[in-house]
Amino acid sequence: PGMSFFKYVAQDFDLMPYTSVAENIGKFLSRFYPEEKEQRTKELLEVIEMSSFANEKVKTLSGGQQQRVAIARALAKEPELILLDEPFGQIDNFKKNSLRRKLFSYLKEKNISCIVATHDGDDALSFADQMMVIKNKKVIAFDSPRNLYKSPLEHYVAALFDDVNELYVDGEKRLIYPHQIQVSKDSSHKAVVKKSFFKGSFWLIEATFNSQVVFFQNPENIVFGKEIGLYFVD
């Protein structure tokens, strides 16, 4: 704030409610170059997937749509650095993934550095070059998202990406994601099924293993009370 090379998109958006989406996006673009202003506005409307809303008043938009307009307005003058605070927090899931891909691809194309403050690991996992994890106002991890996902230092870090089991296996304490556990009839690690949750492409199974609760993914449902063997993938 206060520096032309840096833009910040807060969660309150600070938009002009009684003007159009296009006018909001082009607010800080020069009126002396109307054709360039119009072209830039159209380009950003495509990035946020709101071309059909160009003439709509901002006050008629949903919270998620207003959030997208605020991001586009911040990008209008192509800052060197942009800070996004929970940028997809109010956007529906069906739109979120598409918008994430388009926005972060655009930022890389324009060589705009971006800092994202988020509680959603998906914002970082596929798009960030580096990820900093803060807990109780202290930095507890700083590395690439890939390294933090594959070798989390503690449960808090792993839980940012997915459900995670903190288990003692053969006397060793391990952090294990549900997809890293498979059912194996030959395994000596026995567990008893307690619950199951349909997740679309798989079932999330809850079981007890050595007096510990464990969650794992399975292609099919498993009946309550069944004893199974578990194989833990390294």
Region spans (language model):
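Conserved ABC ATPase signature
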Residues: 57-61, 65
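Conserved ABC ATPase "signature" C-loop
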Residues: 136-137
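Conserved ABC ATPase "signature" region
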Residues: 36-53, 105
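Non-catalytic connector elements of ABC transporters
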Residues: 173-234
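A short, proline-enriched helix->beta-strand linker immediately N-terminal to the Walker B motif
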Residues: 76-80
